[in-house]
From Swiss-Prot:
One of its GO terms (molecular function) is structural constituent of ribosome. This is Large ribosomal subunit protein eL42z/eL42y. GO terms for biological process: translation. Belongs to the eukaryotic ribosomal protein eL42 family. The keyword Metal-binding does not apply. Pfam families: Ribosomal_L44. It comes from the Eukaryota. The keyword Nucleotidyltransferase does not apply. Residues 28-57 are annotated as: Disordered. Keywords: Ribonucleoprotein, Ribosomal protein. It comes from Arabidopsis thaliana. Gene3D superfamilies: 3.10.450.80. InterPro entries: Ribosomal_eL44, Ribosomal_LSU_eL42, Ribosomal_zn-bd.
């Protein structure tokens, strides 16, 4: 289980900052797929009418986890940067810290 603190002091690349500042940490989430994207328009056009499924449906999923991407927002200039971390099954931001010699559960 990966537990990340809610704030992190790290370098800000923005041209106004260019120094170490406090950053607010959130988890990156994928946005909603656009209906206006060219591939989606083409797919919908091909699917319409008679004839069933026209393109292959992908079934051979290889991975069981996704790489976690942290979204860091600078507290002074509000600039966002993203930082990937390793794959993990359980991820939490700002959870209880594990004490010495104690179990978390």
């Amino acid at each position: 289980m990966v537990n990340i603190p809610k704030t992190k002091n790290t370098y800000c690349k923005n041209k106004e900052c260019k120094k170490h500042t406090l950053h607010k940490v959130t988890q990156y989430k994928k946005g909603k797929d656009s209906l206006a994207a060219q591939g989606k328009r083409r797919y919908d056009r091909k699917q319409s009418g008679y004839g069933g499924q026209t393109k292959p449906v992908f079934h051979k999923k290889a991975k069981t986890t996704k790489k976690i991407v942290l979204r860091l927002q600078c507290q002074s200039c509000k600039h966002f940067s993203q930082r990937p971390i390793k794959r993990c099954k359980h991820f939490e931001i700002g959870g209880d810290k594990k004490g010495k010699g104690t179990s978390l559960f």
